[in-house]
Structures are given as C-alpha cells and as structure tokens.
C-alpha cells in the first residue's frame, strides 16, 4: 500500500481514544550502523511541510528589553537575571529542560545560557541553535518573535546517538491523511540524504499512532 493508504489504514484499525493521537514513524537502523563513529551520530531538525498537527511548548530566554513581547508569544519566558537562581536549583533546572521541546534565546543571552543551563539543555539536545533560527536578534520585534515561534512549531528533532531505533512525530489523526503522508514522505527523503549510507543504512520503517499497532512501510 502507498503512504496515504497506510496512514488511513492505521487510523481505521486504531481504537478511538479520549485524546488526539499522534502519527509516528519508527525507524530501525541496521545492526552494523556503528554509533561509536562520530560521523554516524546525528542530531538535527527537520521542518515538516504541513506541521505536526499539535503545538509543542517553546521557552524563550531573554533580557529585560524583550520580556514583554516574548511573554505575548512564547509559552514560557525566562529572564537572563533569573538564570543563576535556576541553575542553583537542580530540580527546577531539570524540570524546565524537560518541559519545553525547544528553547529560543536572545543573542546577547547565549553566553549565560551556556554557563548556567548548558549542562541541563546540552544532553537533551536542546541548546538554542542559530542553524535552526533559535536565536533571535537583540532588538527583535514582536512580529519577528511570532514568526519564529510559528516556524519552530513545525520542527521535529532527530537524535541518533545511543540507539539504533528512534521515533519521529509526523502529524495527528485529525489531519488530512494526504498531509500526514506527505510529511512522512518528505521526512524520509530528507533522512535518506542526511545519514551516512543513506537508505542502505535503514533496516525498516514502521508507522503507528500513539496507542495503535504499527505497520511496516519500508
């Protein structure tokens, strides 16, 4: 079956739940894919063309001058002056690092983030990265922050470091199956070009909903 048929089939065979389920691709790399080699370890983001169908929580870390506009846009805002206090509370720092999918930083605050939160965000691959537009100008306007927030909502993180199996969300059951299928297709095309060995490095790919059985698509 093609991808649209696979998306439809998974939904039809899944029991109705009391929440909106997420479609997920489960990718299994081949057993000889050597994660001990640095070049084989991948941490990257992919922008889903049609988004993921539900919002992720994004935290902004800024100085005083961006507090008000950032507070109107982001799900949570941390002021630079509060970073030492947060870093001194290990439980709070871990909770914040876990609670937000993406962290955005005002450019001038980046050195402080590395100093105070680096050991909490780094291992989770959540340090703000300019490559993905996670660092905003010091004089950013509210509309710039809103544009950043909306674009980052489409990102999914790929982390291949310790395990040969990983999952990636590609949409929800409320989305048009054609859009979910296109998200899946575009992601896989990107992945084939992103990892060493390309498609030959992949053993199998499965599609599932949060609480459904999976079906093999590759």
What residue spans do the PLM features occupy?
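Flexible glycine-/small-residue-rich
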Residues: 62, 170-172, 209-211
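Translation machinery proteins
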Residues: 13-68, 89-92
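Residue-level signature of catalytic and energy-coupling elements of molecular machines
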Residues: 6, 70, 122, 207
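A conserved acidic, glycine/proline-rich C-terminal tail/linker
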Residues: 182-196
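Structural motif
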Residues: 24, 56-59, 76, 101-104, ...
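Long, charge-patterned amphipathic alpha-helical coiled-coil/hairpin "stalk" segments used as oligomerization
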Residues: 80-181, 185
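Flexible, glycine/charged-enriched surface loops at secondary-structure junctions
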Residues: 19-23, 158-160, 194-206
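C-terminal edge-of-domain segments
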Residues: 206-218
